[in-house]
Amino acid sequence: RKMAAAAVNGAAGFSSSGPAATSGAVLQAATGMYEQLKGEWNRKSPNLSKCGEELGRLKLVLLELNFLPTTGTKLTKQQLILARDILEIGAQWSILRKDIPSFERYMAQLKCYYFDYKEQLPESAYMHQLLGLNLLFLLSQNRVAEFHTELERLPAKDIQTNVYIKHPVSLEQYLMEGSYNKVFLAKGNIPAESYAFFIDILLDTIRDEIAGCIEKAYEKILFTEATRILFFNTPKKMTDYAKKRGWVLGPNNYYSFASQQQKPEDTTIPSTELAKQVIEYARQLEMIV
């Protein structure tokens, strides 16, 4: 609390040994700090380290002034909007920093403003984008139950018509159908650039699942066929991925998996058939695309 007070006093021009600042002056100081953060964040290429420092100071101020709606304190509309705006920048900053735990923390706090205070505050321009990002985050982590819990909090109209919400909802449907080609195509139709981060994580997970099926169902696979099945658009990306999985390309341009095959007595017919069905489905995706 002393650190937060010092941050506010410094921004407001008060001495730490002087009289306590009025709530209005403290709010004004916090607003000034937010404007500094906003100015840096809105630059074409924001300094993420500087933004992180500003966010750290502002979080302390929010805690000191009880801006976060977790203390039972009655807050003014201006205070709530200021806190919400700061947290929204924090969530977006976390995506650029590729800091998933930070994004999850910011979203946990933001949901208080989006749901608990929705009748008291004007709707944020970033609300649907961030709620959609949160759905995509849960999907990328395979937290499907939580995905549906969060979805239940949203109006049916948003789920059906809002571009930010529809995107992760469609992705979840494609995954349930096994329509992996549609998931990969969805990357080219993201509603905001920030969605690419979690989609890439989701696509990597899908590739790993397909690659696991390839290893179980085939003794060898042609390089070009593997490239197509795994949805890579360049040979280099296929080569890099193969190295990551320990695949070795033979002189005949085949990847061999003999050493990774299960022993015949340990292989069950259902799992083998399922793997082959997945590969056969993937093989036909080129025609669909």
From Swiss-Prot:
Keywords: Isopeptide bond, Phosphoprotein, Proteasome, Ubl conjugation. The gene is PSMD8. PROSITE patterns: PCI (PS50250). Residues 101-270 form the PCI domain. InterPro entries: 26S_Psome_Rpn12, CSN8_PSD8_EIF3K, PCI_dom. Coiled coil: none annotated. The modification Phosphoserine is found at S45. Belongs to the proteasome subunit S14 family. The keyword Cell membrane does not apply. GO terms for biological process: proteasome-mediated ubiquitin-dependent protein catabolic process. This is 26S proteasome non-ATPase regulatory subunit 8. Pfam families: CSN8_PSD8_EIF3K. Component of the 26S proteasome, a multiprotein complex involved in the ATP-dependent degradation of ubiquitinated proteins. This complex plays a key role in the maintenance of protein homeostasis by removing misfolded or damaged proteins, which could impair cellular functions, and by removing proteins whose functions are no longer required. Therefore, the proteasome participates in numerous cellular processes, including cell cycle progression, apoptosis, or DNA damage repair. One of its GO terms (cellular component) is proteasome regulatory particle, lid subcomplex. There is a cross-link at K236 (Glycyl lysine isopeptide (Lys-Gly) (interchain with G-Cter in SUMO2)). Component of the 19S proteasome regulatory particle complex. The 26S proteasome consists of a 20S core particle (CP) and two 19S regulatory subunits (RP). The regulatory particle is made of a lid composed of 9 subunits including PSMD8, a base containing 6 ATPases and few additional components. Interacts with DDI2. Interacts with TASOR.
